[in-house]
């Protein structure tokens, strides 16, 4: 809700931060606290805000109520997927390789009424995998690998191509010896 700041710039800034491999991306709504310069200049700057705590910006000349709602939902998406180590690498790649990914994934989560639901790590992994399967099949294997690396069940859909039953080790093992390095811990 900053003055002169548009919704498309928020999406651009998220892509820029993802490009820098930011560890986390936090989007929060602007609050106009009593006694601050921004609050004193709110009318001049075209900022409408809640008169009740936490005094959140509701609208500006540049960003509508519905666009601020989209920004809030984008924050939820980032918290659930980008800011979660298990899904961060895949989410970052999708953000960087397709300018429309955030818009598409947000629309997908919103249409499924999931954007405001609390979701377990497993549920988020299932959603991301299914979304990739439907919309980005070239990332399906990467989603499955992220699922397995996160320690999720091999009996669930993302691990569907992993063989776990009746697997017999080879008659002869190819043993590879190497040197232990403390940095491998």
Question: What are these language model-derived features?
Answer:
Residues 1-99:
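A structural motif corresponding to the C-terminal lobe/cap of the Radical SAM core domain
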Residues 73-185:
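Radical SAM enzyme core and accessory elements
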């Amino acid at each position: 809700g900053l003055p002169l700041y548009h919704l498309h710039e928020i999406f651009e800034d998220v892509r820029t931060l993802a490009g820098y491999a930011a560890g986390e991306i936090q989007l929060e709504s602007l609050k106009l606290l009593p006694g601050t310069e921004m609050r004193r200049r709110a009318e001049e700057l075209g900022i409408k805000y809640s008169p009740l705590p936490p005094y959140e910006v509701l609208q500006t000349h540049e960003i509508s109520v519905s666009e601020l709602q989209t920004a809030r939902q984008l924050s939820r998406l980032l918290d659930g997927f980008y800011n979660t180590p298990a899904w961060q690498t895949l989410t970052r790649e999708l953000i960087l390789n397709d300018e429309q990914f955030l818009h598409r994934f947000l629309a997908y989560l919103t249409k499924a009424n999931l954007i405001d639901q609390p979701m377990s790590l497993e549920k988020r992994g299932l959603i991301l995998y299914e979304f990739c399967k439907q919309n980005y099949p070239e990332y399906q294997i990467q989603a499955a690998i992220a699922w397995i690396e996160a320690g999720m069940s091999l009996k669930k859909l993302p691990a569907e191509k992993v063989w776990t039953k009746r697997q017999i080790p080879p008659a002869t093992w190819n043993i590879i010896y190497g040197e232990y390095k403390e940095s491998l811990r």
